[in-house]
């Protein structure tokens, strides 16, 4: 069974999002996604300063098996990326919720209300 | 409607080992049992085992067996002078395309064992039966779905196999590479698909679970199709359906060495077409110098024109992306080329295959 922490938000495309106290978002891929991908061997993350729209493919995660896009959960500006995870891609498999990928400053704070909660994401991946 | 997935006699062993199962050529097969990379390293460093029961063993017997195989296959079974020797060969269609690649063991004068790919097995049997009728040949072809096959591979694979089956030691200790022997209930072939030493062991289906359990107890790591793919890529071995198929000449896919033209009197299916169409491509390995992962069907740009990757992956042994590429004839090992990786041109170095052999990086 995949872990789906209650204190995070989710997208249908398998990103997890932590809403930080300062209004910024921390983004990663879910435990369900890392298990499906298998051994992660390469990540390409967006640079700080890049402006992204909601649903835009802005990062790439590659496992031994296949390459997958990672999508911006909401519109905004990338304010940080996790270089330690690109140096150790296997950390995504070890703990998908500790291995954050990038941080985002949302263009509109209200946009996050459309994200799934843990129960909604659990339903999404139940099939 | 798709037919329901077929299961090998080892299916319950896979469930017990918590395999992640996927559809492979209509078979429900393990892709990994946790980490594909750990399974890969187990084969390079110690010993791993693969359920290859989805592949099909066929027994061929009869007075015309040798003559018929010399016509069926582009490689020449006349090379198999002693019982037990094995040969890798392509079975071609009349236009020189590859129907399948297979291994044939000579068991005795008029008796052979052929092992073909899972995805092509039904097509292969139909083709072979047609060829028996066309010759016509006095041979009997018997598909052996009553057998399960386990490939045990790695530097310690043989020792681990003897630990699991002590009764096999005496009969298989002096078995040279690329040969096999029937030892009681077991057919043991010293062949493989990983670039490592090891045995491919065929057992009656009702003994398969016990054999798997004995190998497990001897410390052999179960490995899935995922590791099988990264291992065979490192070992420079083609995968049917990906690196070659019925539309490709073996000459264009790095398999020219399996075409035996020494006996000019020998005619084989596809020979005329091959002689009329010399190779237009060569196959080299690519090692990605930039960061990223190579996959199949990426465009390769060289000073001599464009090429294409046919298989690509991340190599756990080299810790770099590698690929097979079909390239214009002028390109040579050592040259640097560019590969279109998801819209970016990344630098790759051309190398001779294989990338890895017997646990050692060769590039």
From Swiss-Prot, chain A:
| UniProt xrefs under Pfam families | GCV_H
Gene (UniProt): gcvH
Stretch forming the signal peptide: none
Q: Quaternary structure per UniProt?
A: The glycine cleavage system is composed of four proteins: P, T, L and H.
BP GO terms, sorted? glycine decarboxylation via glycine cleavage system
The entry's family comment says: Belongs to the GcvH family.
Cofactor dependence is on: (R)-lipoate
Q: List residues of the Lipoyl-binding domain.
A: 24-105
What does the entry list under GO cellular component?
A: cytosol; glycine cleavage complex
Q: What function is annotated for this protein?
A: The glycine cleavage system catalyzes the degradation of glycine. The H protein shuttles the methylamine group of glycine from the P protein to the T protein.
Keywords assigned by UniProt, alphabetized: Lipoyl
This protein is called Glycine cleavage system H protein
Q: Cofactor stoichiometry and binding?
A: Binds 1 lipoyl cofactor covalently.
The chain residues annotated with the modification N6-lipoyllysine are 65
Species in which this protein is naturally found: Azoarcus sp. (strain BH72)
Q: Which PANTHER family match?
A: GLYCINE CLEAVAGE SYSTEM H PROTEIN, GLYCINE CLEAVAGE SYSTEM H PROTEIN-RELATED
């Amino acid at each position: 069974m995949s872990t789906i922490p209650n204190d995070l938000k989710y997208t249908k495309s398998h990103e997890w999002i932590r809403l930080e106290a300062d209004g910024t978002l921390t983004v990663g891929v879910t435990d369900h996604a890392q298990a499906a991908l298998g051994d992660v061997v390469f990540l390409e993350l967006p640079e700080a300063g890049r402006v992204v729209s909601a649903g835009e493919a802005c990062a790439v995660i590659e496992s031994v098996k296949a390459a997958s896009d990672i999508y911006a959960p909401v519109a905004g500006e990338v304010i940080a990326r996790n270089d330690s995870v690109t140096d150790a891609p296997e950390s995504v498999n070890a703990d998908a919720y500790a291995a954050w990928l990038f941080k985002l400053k949302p263009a509109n704070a209200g946009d996050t209300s459309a994200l799934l909660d843990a129960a909604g994401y659990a339903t999404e991946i139940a099939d | 409607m798709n037919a329901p997935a077929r299961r090998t006699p080892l299916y319950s062993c896979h469930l017990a080992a918590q395999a992640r199962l996927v559809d492979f050529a209509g078979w429900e097969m393990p892709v990994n049992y946790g980490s594909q990379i750990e399974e890969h390293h187990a084969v390079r460093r110690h010993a791993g085992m693969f359920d290859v029961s989805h592949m099909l063993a066929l027994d061929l017997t009869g007075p015309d067996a040798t003559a018929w195989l010399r016509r069926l296959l582009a490689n020449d079974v006349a090379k198999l002078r002693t019982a037990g020797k094995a040969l890798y060969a392509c079975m071609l269609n009349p236009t020189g395309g590859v129907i399948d690649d297979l291994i044939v063991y000579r068991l005795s004068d008029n008796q052979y064992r052929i092992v073909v790919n899972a995805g092509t097995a039904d097509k292969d049997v139909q083709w072979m039966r047609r060829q028996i009728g066309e010759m016509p040949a006095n041979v009997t072809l018997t598909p052996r779905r009553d057998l399960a096959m386990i490939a045990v591979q790695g530097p310690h694979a043989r020792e681990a196999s003897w630990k699991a089956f002590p009764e096999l030691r005496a009969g298989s200790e002096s078995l040279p590479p690329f040969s096999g022997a029937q030892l009681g209930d077991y057919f043991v072939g010293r062949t493989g698909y990983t670039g490592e030493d090891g045995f491919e062991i065929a057992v009656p289906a009702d003994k398969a679970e016990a054999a798997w359990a004995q190998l497990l107890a001897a410390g052999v790591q179960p490995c899935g199709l995922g590791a099988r793919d990264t291992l065979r890529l490192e070992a420079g071995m083609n995968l049917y359906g990906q690196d070659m198929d019925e539309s490709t000449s073996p000459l264009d896919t790095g398999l020219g060495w399996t075409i035996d033209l020494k006996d000019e009197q020998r005619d084989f299916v596809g020979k005329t077409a091959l002689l009329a169409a010399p190779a237009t491509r060569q196959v080299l390995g690519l090692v990605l110098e930039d960061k990223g992962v190579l996959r199949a069907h990426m465009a390769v740009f060289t000073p001599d024109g464009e090429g294409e990757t046919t298989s690509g992956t991340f190599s756990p042994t080299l810790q770099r992306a590698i690929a097979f590429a079909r390239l214009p004839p002028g390109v040579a090992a050592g040259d640097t080329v560019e590969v279109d990786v998801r819209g970016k041109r990344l630098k790759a170095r051309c190398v001779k295959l294989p990338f890895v052999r017997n646990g050692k990086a060769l590039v």
